[in-house]
UniProtKB/Swiss-Prot annotation:
Belongs to the bacterial ribosomal protein bS6 family. It holds the Pfam family Ribosomal_S6. This is Small ribosomal subunit protein bS6. GO terms for biological process: translation. Gene3D superfamilies: 3.30.70.60. HAMAP family: Ribosomal_bS6 (MF_00360). InterPro entries: Ribosomal_bS6, Ribosomal_bS6_sf, Ribosomal_S6_plastid/chlpt, Transl_elong_EF1B/ribsomal_bS6. The lineage of its organism: Bacteria, Pseudomonadati, Pseudomonadota, Alphaproteobacteria, Hyphomicrobiales. CDD domains: bS6 (cd00473). Keywords: Ribonucleoprotein, Ribosomal protein, RNA-binding, rRNA-binding. One of its GO terms (cellular component) is cytosolic small ribosomal subunit. It comes from Chelativorans sp. (strain BNC1). The keyword Plastid does not apply.
Length: 148
């Protein structure tokens, strides 16, 4: 049996339970064809680069498959018929990656905050602490410009 990575995009108006039901449905297709499903990663709702079937966002899901080609073809056939699936792509790989995918790692990186691993802003001793913005000198309004 060959190893595959399969990603599919489901419509944004589905609930999370409906997306999980789709995953279980296609997992059943693979298992009935004699294959196995490894990890399943739900990447959540993401914005699309362009509209697909009048949708600007979609649920992204990754599945690692160890299945014969016939089972994968049957799953792809059923996905092509389903109105809930916007796009899908299956890629044959030599080995499945260990640990979380690059998409999940990127999501974890964003949770660290704006400055990442650099920590909070520091005060530079030679300049002193930053002053609050409201202490700036008052700005001239447009009404003041005409008086001169």
């Amino acid at each position: 049996m060959a190893l595959y990575e399969h990603v599919f995009l489901a419509r944004q108006d589905l609930s999370a339970q409906q997306v999980d039901a789709l995953v279980e449905q296609y997992k059943g297709v693979i298992e009935s064809g004699g294959g196995k499903v490894g990890r399943i990663e739900n990447w959540g709702v993401k914005s699309l680069a362009y509209r697909i079937k009048k949708n600007r966002k979609a649920y992204f899901t990754l599945m690692d498959l160890d299945a014969p080609a016939e089972a994968v073809k049957e799953m792809e056939r059923q996905m092509g018929i389903s109105e809930d699936i916007l796009r899908f792509m299956t890629i044959r790989v030599e080995a499945h990656e260990e640990g979380p995918s690059a998409m999940l790692q990127r999501r974890d990186d964003r949770e660290r905050g704006d400055r990442g691993d650099r920590g909070p802003r520091r005060d530079f001793d030679d300049r002193g602490p930053r002053r609050p913005r409201e202490d700036d000198r008052p700005r001239r309004s447009r009404e003041d410009e005409g008086d001169e």
